[in-house]
Amino acid sequence: MYKKIKLRDQQISELINLESKRQNSQIELIASENYASEDVILANGTSPSNKYGEGYPGKRYYGGCTFIDQIEKIAIERVKKLFKIEYANVQPYSGSSANAAVFAALLKPGDKILGLDLNAGGHLSHGYKINFSGMFYSGISYFLDENELLDYDAIEKIALKTKPNLIICGYSAYSRKIDFARFRQIADKVNAFLLADIAHIAGLIAAGQHPSPVGYAHIITSTTQKTLRGPRGGLILTNSKEIAAKIDKVVFPGIQGGPFFHTIAAKAVAFKEALEPWFKEYCAQIVKNASHFASEFIKKGIRIVSQGTENHLFTIDVLSSYNLNGKQAQILLESVNIITNKNTIPNDTLSPFVTSGLRLGTPAMTSRGFKEQEFSQMAEIIDFVLRKKELNALEIKEIKKKVKILTKNFPIKKSYWP
């Protein structure tokens, strides 16, 4: 899809073109990555990039906001329709910015945040000590059970003991469905706010492929670039008028200045795409592909965290299955043009810079048209590479040839419209 560009800045032009070539020629299995449509990318590089406009539609601190006001209003209305919710803020620059806004709106410094342990699939911004969320707030962790599943009774016990001010559900490497209703019960018992961080599963929720937190979570945050297939950015949703007012005040003037109107325009385009019937079909295929992909490894005797998946991702325990750490596995696969990421697993004994796991996701290659058959091929290739550990020149050449055939047969698409 990506056309060669020619800038007067030849150095940057060449690097952009090399990155486009890399994306076209490699298999992308990082669960948090996707391919935005050409419409989204074009909208993200247009004239609203030049416009400054602190504040909200109709209440800006600058003149000349007639059209950007309309753009932001459209983005808000579309995302509200998409998630069937009353209030939305589309200004956050990222998912972490959205989380920071929620904490600042609802908590005081030192208040307690209860989130999933990072090794078990949580996120840095859910109270981890080296992140702002753990520096300014008191992070407390809950864990998975012996089957590597959420143990709601155990989470409730931790909540009753520690009395958190905010409980977070929503993860970066958890492959099972989340019971938002049960989480709300727990939150209510300790008078805590419930935040659903749906950054990874937002598209699946919008398409009906995962239960929605709307009606259960007091507040919802997300990115827009993962399963929503939009530009890089964040958003905040709620049904509470009171919470919405607090959020708006914190996003601006609390933690951000002028919004990125070019990105808000691109978000609006992505939300329109996500409202189409074919987006539901796409998300259904993501889930089918992930389930099939994981089952192919399980058939080969490979250990998958929680023994499968119900969403778009899963994590292989490469240490016990292949006697490799996650970093080694990632490097090996990249040598044959398959892009993945090392990832911690529950109770990981290795550092986050090495890890025992390898996370795999299906959104990006499903965007290119992969179905179960292609993911069967990927499982065969990945299993072969990781079992071999050291590939000779001929093996590397042969695998790269197979990858090249797949990427040529399934190029990055300009548009997802039928």
Swiss-Prot record:
EC category: transferase
Catalytic activity: (6R)-5,10-methylene-5,6,7,8-tetrahydrofolate + glycine + H2O = (6S)-5,6,7,8-tetrahydrofolate + L-serine
Residues that bind (6S)-5,6,7,8-tetrahydrofolate: 118, 122-124, 351-353
GO cellular component, one term: cytosol
InterPro entries hit by this protein: PyrdxlP-dep_Trfase, PyrdxlP-dep_Trfase_major, PyrdxlP-dep_Trfase_small, Ser_HO-MeTrfase, Ser_HO-MeTrfase-like, Ser_HO-MeTrfase_PLP_BS, SHMT-like_dom
Family matches, as PROSITE patterns: SHMT
PTM sites of type N6-(pyridoxal phosphate)lysine: 226
GO terms for MF: glycine hydroxymethyltransferase activity; pyridoxal phosphate binding
UniProtKB keywords: Cytoplasm, One-carbon metabolism, Pyridoxal phosphate, Transferase
Family the UniProt entry places it in: Belongs to the SHMT family.
Annotated protein name in UniProt: Probable serine hydroxymethyltransferase
Protein's organism: Mesomycoplasma hyopneumoniae (strain J / ATCC 25934 / NCTC 10110)
